[in-house]
From Swiss-Prot:
Alphabetized UniProt keyword annotations: Cell cycle, Cell division, Chaperone, Cytoplasm, Isomerase, Rotamase
Location of the PPIase FKBP-type domain: 160-245
Domain remark in the UniProt entry: Consists of 3 domains; the N-terminus binds the ribosome, the middle domain has PPIase activity, while the C-terminus has intrinsic chaperone activity on its own.
Record-level GO cellular component terms: cytoplasm
Family statement: Belongs to the FKBP-type PPIase family. Tig subfamily.
Protein name (Swiss-Prot/TrEMBL): Trigger factor
Pfam family, one: Trigger_C
GO biological process: 'de novo' cotranslational protein folding; cell division; chaperone-mediated protein folding; protein transport; protein unfolding
Keyword check for Nucleotide-binding: no
PROSITE patterns hit by this protein: FKBP_PPIASE
Gene3D superfamilies, sorted: 3.10.50.40, Trigger factor ribosome-binding domain, Trigger factor, C-terminal domain
Native source organism of the sequence: Shewanella baltica (strain OS155 / ATCC BAA-1091)
InterPro entries, sorted: PPIase_dom_sf (IPR046357), PPIase_FKBP_dom (IPR001179), Trig_fac (IPR005215), Trigger_fac_C (IPR008880), Trigger_fac_C_sf (IPR037041), Trigger_fac_ribosome-bd_bac (IPR008881), Trigger_fac_ribosome-bd_sf (IPR036611), Trigger_fact/SurA_dom_sf (IPR027304)
Compartmental location: Cytoplasm
Length: 434
């Protein structure tokens, strides 16, 4: 085998590989002989079909298969010999056979050489927060509202009330599609409706008929309503006030607390809040570290890796649509290219961090991650056992652990400052509720 390597553009490499023609001819001949022994052709006894007949019938297909195998096998030998690391599957272009050699071209991309830079220039503001008694009380109030019962009242509608109504919406005096409803139920203050709609109902009583003026947001999903002024003619049929449950042992029982009553519920709530806080703090620091790493390191990305990541993201997006995908056109790659490129770049850079620091997933950390995740389930031990018995899930958790270790390694050289933050403020920002 003879090999020549050509750097075409960027990360693309072109291998020209020559293989002795006699090698292919021998493989073809051997394959034809094997086929002759098992072929069943009318007019010939089993195992007695002449090679010329087999060649006429199957020769072209056999030769094509052999050439494919030869190209694949010799390509692998060539990249090992040339110390090349392909970032994707090669494209093979078979050339001619001159009687002495068979030549083919393999084109592919290689992984870029990554040299980490600017690690000491990464700036991280590390938030410090804790769950206080007041935070637990706030969560209990949220849970009370979620378990509220409602009863009709003869008074003006107030924030937090549920109302029932009939309404008809119009733009420029014309009703629009989707702007009409009967027996519509709405909790005031929920933010379900466009700005101004809920506020326009406050202060009105059941039985009243009135009109409110609102404006559809510029980013509204219906193109014909974006930014439009609208009127809604409303008939308020019922106002219901919330009755919140008392905070006692009976309230705790609503959440499956059979022993310990209210204090046990508070302890469980605090544990869950601490778990969520720890995850959010980690995610916040990780995002800052990753953003700093990306900003300080510009690398050429293999198109093959980006294309592969685009396909993964597209498949995930299609799965989120569920059963609605039957008649949907394929989502364009452009929707995912930027996110895919970011993910590929992060993977390459963190891979180099792991390699440079000779990191290996710590078993104790892996088990800690599994235990933390399992604690959110009714039977944590069952979840832990399931993960430990599943190779794929365990590999995923090892990857998560390695990523954590890589971020921690980067933090050692980063410029880190600490900042005290309140639990509620931090969690609202982390979950996009700020």
């Amino acid at each position: 085998m003879q090999v020549s390597v050509e750097a075409t553009q960027g990360l693309e490499r072109r291998l020209t590989i020559s293989v002795p023609a006699e090698q292919i001819e021998k493989l073809v001949k051997d394959s034809l002989q094997r086929e002759a022994k098992r072929a069943r052709i009318p007019g010939f006894r089993p195992g007695k079909v002449p090679i010329t007949v087999i060649n006429k019938r199957y020769g072209a297909a056999i030769r094509q298969d052999i050439m494919g195998e030869v190209m694949q096998r010799n390509f692998i030998e060539a990249i090992i010999a040339e110390k090349l690391n392909p970032a994707g599957a090669p494209t093979f272009v078979p050339g001619s056979t001159d009687g002495e050699k068979f030549e083919f071209i393999a084109t592919f991309e290689i992984y870029p050489e990554v040299e980490l830079k600017g690690l000491d220039a990464i700036e991280v503001e590390q938030p410090k927060a804790e769950v206080t008694d007041a935070d637990v009380d706030t969560m209990i109030e949220t849970l009370r509202k979620q378990h509220a019962t409602f009863a009709a009242v003869e008074r003006e509608a107030a924030d937090g009330d549920k109302v029932k109504m009939n309404f008809v919406g119009s733009v420029d005096g014309e009703e629009f599609e989707g702007g009409k409803a009967d027996d519509f139920e709405l909790q005031l203050g929920s933010g379900r409706m466009i700005p101004g709609f809920e506020a326009g109902i406050l202060g009105h009583k059941a039985g009243e008929e009135f009109v409110i003026d609102v404006n559809f947001p510029e980013e509204y999903h219906a193109e014909n309503l974006k930014g439009k002024a609208a009127k809604f003619a409303i008939t308020l049929t019922e106002v219901q006030a919330a009755n919140l449950p008392e905070v006692n042992d009976e309230f705790a029982a609503l959440f499956g607390i059979s022993e310990g009553g209210l204090e046990a519920l508070k302890a469980e709530i605090r544990k869950n809040m601490n778990r969520e806080l720890e995850q959010a703090l980690k995610a916040n620091v990780k995002e800052q570290v990753i953003n700093g790493l990306l900003a300080n390191n510009d690398i050429t990305l293999p198109k093959a890796l980006i294309d592969g990541e685009v396909n993964v993201l597209r498949q995930q997006a299609m799965q989120r649509f569920g059963n609605q995908t039957a008649n949907m056109p394929e989502l364009p790659a452009e929707l995912f290219t930027e996110q895919a490129a970011r993910r590929v770049k992060i993977g390459l850079l963190l891979g180099e961090v792991i390699k440079t620091n000779e990191l290996k997933a710590e078993d104790e950390r892996v088990q800690g991650l599994i235990a933390s995740m399992a604690s959110a389930y009714e039977d944590p031990s069952e979840v832990v056992a399931y993960y430990n018995s599943n190779k794929e899930l365990m590999q995923n958790m090892r990857n998560v652990a390695l990523e954590e270790q890589a971020v921690e390694a980067l933090l050692k050289s980063a410029k880190v400052t600490e900042k005290e933050v309140a639990f509620e403020e931090f969690m609202n920002k982390a979950t996009g509720r700020a």
